[in-house]
Each structure stands twice: as C-alpha cells, then as structure tokens.
C-alpha cells in the first residue's frame, strides 16, 4: 500500500491509548482522539444515534409491557440497588469528591503544559499525554520501567498460582481443541480432588473484527442434565497489542490488573454449581465483586515473587518499583471516577424516561 517504513495506528483501544499517552505531536493526538470518540457519530451509514433512540424506545416499551413505568424500575427491582433513588443517591454522594480530585489532576496537567511553554488549557487529547508526565514528575515512575516484569506468560502463571493456593484447583493446557484464534489458549481446570471443573479459554490479542476491551464470557454455561453436572466452558477475552514475531508480550501494570480481574470472573463461572442457569444469576450489580477481589492479588508480595520477573534476567521486580507503582496507582482516580459517573448518570437518565420525545436529540441529551 505504499506504506513501507510507516507506522499505522488503528482506532482499536490498544492502539489509540498508547498513542494518546506518548505521541508528542499534538495535532495527531487531536486527530486520533476525535476519530476515536466519534465512532458511530459521523452522520453516515454507520451512525448510531438513531440506534440509541430505537434502543431506549424498545426498552421503555418492554418495561411497560411488564407493568413498570420505566426501564430503570424494571431492571433495578432484581438488583441490589432495588430502585432509582438509591442509584442516584450513590452517584450524587460520590460525584463532588471525584470532581474535586479531577480538578486537582487537571491543575497538575495544565502546570505540565505551561512548564513546556504551552499557551493553552488541556483538551481531551492532551489529558493522557500530560497526565503521564505529571505522574512521572510526582512519583518518578515510567510505565515502561515495569513492562519487562509483566511478561504475559508469567502473568498467566501468577493467576494460576493464586487459584491453586486459595482453592487447590489446577490448570493444564489443552492442545487438541478448537480455538477462536491460533494465538488463543485453552486449559482444563480441575478441582483439588482431581474432578473436572471446566474449560478456560484465554484470547489475548486484538485482531480485525474482534470486539474492543476485555471481558469474560462462555461457550457453555454450567447446568445439570440427567442428574449429572455439565461443566462450563468459559472464555476470557483481552485486546493486548500482539508483539512482533519472536518478541515477548510485555504488559502494563493496568493490563496485568485486567488479567487478574477477568480471571476473577472466570473463577466465578468455573465454580458455578446450579441446576437452572438461566434463573440462577446473581444480581447484576454484584457481578463485579469476584473480579474486584481477584485483581488485588496482582500486587501481593508473595504473588509478585511468582510472576513479576524480568523477562530477560529472571530478576523479581524490585520492591521500590512496586511501592512506586502502588502509590501512583491511585493517581488519576478523579478523572477515571468522573468518567464512570458521567456514563452512569447518562445511562440512568435515558432509562428513567417515561416517554421518549419524537425529537430526542442524542448529542444534546
């Protein structure tokens, strides 16, 4: 395509985020940021604004058919939150503190811009770039310092080690099994008594046509048939950048935490023991608990000694680097939390509507 010697950046998350974090050219950061944030919002055949309108309309109709005045009331009744007021009360309680912290972080970022002679206030495409600089200035920590200690194969050993220590379960790779991609791996999970618990797939790298982000799903849910347990087939899916041939896959600290997080979901599914899966779900707002718990094992000293080893020398990650990583880990929570809260408010505001206006403007809502 005449692009020999050039770098190609796609609008996949693992390509966009490092670019926004490290690219020095502000105009290019702006270009990729706007392209990324406006996916599905370009007034063309792939525009999703009308789809959003159709979704909220169909959901309200479904709720009415079930006897509820809006979709949020219908969904929340079966969740721990129970009602709309409890959700808004929680969001309203967190918002002021998160916003105050985000403003502090913004001040740090604008200070970094001025330090470099910039005569402008931070925009969306500046945030990650200058946030990385502010973080490095505060904690003397470069994310790339940690990557050599988080080689993907070692991280996988770490999650299996935790599961074995806590629950006595083991994971053995299965070679002769269909897989969604040649780079995906499959493992048989056995309980401490040697009985078959299930199969775990791990699909690590981004590729064309693959959904973005990371999640845990399944090809088969656990159930019972004719009195016998049908074991689950669970999948954890990630979108890490695939390394060049012959090179190791080195993860960031955040990506490492993501592996532990999704593995927590996988354990939840593998340990499942219900007769009627479709009516045996936990409340939706409980679902993240097992994964949130599991991700904390990523920085436990005993666990780090097992998996956080330099991919070339085998040296265990220095404690001083771990301490800086933990301290810096909370930096940026203001921005991250306000982003989550804003999405939560938007979600609730759509789904408490009692009527959907014919002229609903998705961009202004």
Spell out what each predicted region is.
Residues 1-10, 53, 58, 64-239, ...:
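Active-site-proximal, well-structured secondary-structure segments within enzyme catalytic domains
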Residues 3, 13, 42, 46:
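Substrate/cofactor-recognition hotspot
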Residues 6-9, 17-22, 31, 68:
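Propeptide (latency) domains of metzincin metalloproteases
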Residues 22-39, 78:
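Short, charge-rich amphipathic alpha-helices with coiled-coil/heptad character
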Residues 37, 241-244, 264, 268-275, ...:
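Hydrophobic alpha-helix feature that most strongly marks membrane-spanning transmembrane helices
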Residues 44, 48, 148, 152, ...:
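Alpha-helix N-cap/helix-initiation motif
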Residues 60-67, 163, 242, 247-270, ...:
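Active-site recognition of the HExxH zinc-binding catalytic motif
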Residues 272-294, 299:
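The catalytic-center signature of Zn2+-dependent metalloproteases
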């Amino acid at each position: 395509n005449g692009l020999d010697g050039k770098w190609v950046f796609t609008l996949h998350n693992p390509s966009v985020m490092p670019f926004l974090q490290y690219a020095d050219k502000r105009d290019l950061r702006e270009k990729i940021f706007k392209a990324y944030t406006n996916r599905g919002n370009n007034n063309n055949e792939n525009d999703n604004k009308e789809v959003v309108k159709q979704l909220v309309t169909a959901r309200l109709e479904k709720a009415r058919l079930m006897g509820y005045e809006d979709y949020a009331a219908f969904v929340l009744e079966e969740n721990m939150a129970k009602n709309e007021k409890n959700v808004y009360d929680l969001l309203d309680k967190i918002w002021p503190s998160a916003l105050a912290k985000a403003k502090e972080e913004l001040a740090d970022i604008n200070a970094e811009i001025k330090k470099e002679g910039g005569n402008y206030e931070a925009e969306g495409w500046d945030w990650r770039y200058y946030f990385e600089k502010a973080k490095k200035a505060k904690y003397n920590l470069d994310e790339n310092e940690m990557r050599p200690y988080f080689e993907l194969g070692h991280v996988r050993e770490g999650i299996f080690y935790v599961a074995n220590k806590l629950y006595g379960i083991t994971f053995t790779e299965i070679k002769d099994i269909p897989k969604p991609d040649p780079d995906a791996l499959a493992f048989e999970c056995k309980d401490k008594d040697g009985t078959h618990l299930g199969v775990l797939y791990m699909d690590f790298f981004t590729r064309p046509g693959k959904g973005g982000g990371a999640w845990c799903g399944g090809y088969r849910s656990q159930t019972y048939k004719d009195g016998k347990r049908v074991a689950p087939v669970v999948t954890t899916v990630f979108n890490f950048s695939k390394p060049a041939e012959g090179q190791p896959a080195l993860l960031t600290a955040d990506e490492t935490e993501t592996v532990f997080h999704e593995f927590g979901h996988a354990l939840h599914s593998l340990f499942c023991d219900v007769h009627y899966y479709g009516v045996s779900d936990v409340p939706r707002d409980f679902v993240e608990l097992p994964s949130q718990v599991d991700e904390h094992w990523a920085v436990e000293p005993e666990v780090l000694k097992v998996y956080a080893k330099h991919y070339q020398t085998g040296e265990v990650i220095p404690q001083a680097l771990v301490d800086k990583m933990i301290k810096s880990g909370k930096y940026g929570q203001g921005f991250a939390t306000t982003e989550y809260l804003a999405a939560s408010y938007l979600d609730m505001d759509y789904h408490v509507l009692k009527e959907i206006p014919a002229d609903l403007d998705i961009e202004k809502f």
